[in-house]
């Protein structure tokens, strides 16, 4: 049997070869008229295809952690954006229902994680269904497409903000405790912060505060009781900003009069809102929508990593100790 050359078919129809691949992969973005033309051409060349668009099964998987409601909101927004397309949606949680998740992977075409930092799960899903297209949101460790924030850049922005406000002697940065296993994004934020601050103020003392995520008891008040406490705290995540603000309140410290607080992600997680390194979640959803509707041809299993720019949003929680030089 003769081998079919998709590029020749594309030239015959005066379209791009990418469009031919999209029709073969049942992509939703190809117009009905173009789809029929491509299917007819494929059938003439002996590659028999059905012109009807088949509904695709999409797994929406989110982790049950402190930010699960935030992740669910992102996935629901994505689902609403794609509501007019023939998708079948299934919600899964791979950590608490791994057996069911892997079973659902067999018949799914797309899996969207928010997030998935576990390479083992990724490998197992690909073993069960090699054609499964995996998008990973808010984490850039694994996935065919990984859409995340530029955490290192965010840490650098935090360091510049504190430096410009005169906090150059004694600072603290909060990160998860090692047993929590959520180190990647938080670690990159802390690394960016440390690297930039060491460049700007080499003699600055920076304490690394490990805060357990799975304990109800807040250990931060003990750190804030020291006579030589830091002048500012960079909280590398939503949870840490909340905990730090609560610890300051419990210790009788006022923000920013007694101590400054700089957060990451959502300024309104504290009352009143704190200065924060933020990103636009709409961008994550928009890019996820684009890649679902325009599935790329990925060769050799090489993943595509997309990092979103960060920006500073100020609300007056960082006290200015001296003017910027």
Q: Each predicted region: which residue ranges?
A:
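Short beta-strand elements in bilobed, periplasmic/extracellular small-molecule ligand-binding domains
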Residues: 79-93, 170-172, 190-215
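Hydrophobic alpha-helical segments within soluble ligand-binding/sensing domains
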Residues: 147-173, 214-222, 279-298
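Alpha-helical recognition/docking segments in bacterial nutrient-uptake
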Residues: 56-160
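Periplasmic-binding protein-like
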Residues: 59-61, 107-115, 171-178, 227-240, ...
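An alpha-beta-alpha
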Residues: 158-200, 302-319
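Short beta-strand segments enriched in small/hydrophobic residues
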Residues: 19-21, 53-67, 169-179
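N-terminal helix-turn-helix DNA-binding module of bacterial transcription factors
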Residues: 1-54
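Flexible loop/turn connectors
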Residues: 6, 221-325
